Amino acid sequence: MLSIEGLHVTYGGAVQALRGVSMQIPDGEVVAVLGSNGAGKSTLLRTISGTLRLHRGRIDAGSVRFGDVDLGSRDPGQTVRLGVVQVPEGRRIFGRLTVEENLRAGGMGNRDKAAKARAQARVYEMFPVLKERSSQRGALLSGGEQQMLAIGRALMASPKVLLLDEPSLGLAPRIIGQIGEVVAEINRQGTSVLLVEQNATMALGVADTAFVLDVGEVSLSGSARELAQTDEVQRLYLGHDTDQPHAPTTGAARRTLSRWTA
């Protein structure tokens, strides 16, 4: 299990990006984190993946643990070897390399040739278009194909937990739906997923549990299905007019949803 407890993060010693954030990503589940720009979503992933220091950020308090291991003191390479792998926002593939070379780069930390071959076969099975274009340079792929390649490259490391940072960013609605299906399939194959998204429809559609980040704090949490029924999420993230009559939240939902206050 990936566990975040009481996490406080600042940039440059002055800008407080996360304030007392706590959440858990249980084994075998998809957990979604919603929030607007500047809410702290990317900072959360940077802290988990070990890349926070590269952005002049630091952990002031709290912890990030994967099982018994403290990730707060690990560098990105160590975190990947432990099985926690991030797909960064904006895809960031190697445009001058071919699809196959990008995938090989993702598996560089794995010295087991048979395991790398299995991982590549898994990627090509999940994304047949990447196999068709294996000799094509990454820069020539469409936006959706580049996102598939970014996810595939991360899967080459055989992650136990996959961190996805805004995978729907800049993609057409049809492709966003396909990305959601991919997330669900990755999870069905045994990988836990922490999905950071602004597209609440896709995220809540595939997640088991969800959290809402607001200016660095968790403002709401609960099951994804129940969160989707709240006025706040419907108004801010699903574009629904909550002044119109709708089915009331059930008693069970009210009990399990948690609103966080300072």
Go through the PLM ranges and name each one:
Residues M1-I4, H8-G20, P26-D27, L52-G57, ...:
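A short, flexible loop at the N-terminus of ABC-type nucleotide-binding domains that lies
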Residues G12-G13, V31, L52-H55, R74, ...:
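ABC-type ATPase nucleotide-binding domains, specifically the catalytic core motifs of the NBD
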Residues L34-S36:
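The feature captures the beta-strand-to-loop junction immediately N-terminal to the Walker
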Residues S49:
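Helix-to-loop junction immediately C-terminal to a conserved catalytic motif
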Residues L52, S63-T79, S223:
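ABC ATPase NBD Q-loop/coupling interface
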Residues R137-L141, E145:
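Conserved ABC ATPase signature
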Residues A154-L155:
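ABC ATPase C-loop
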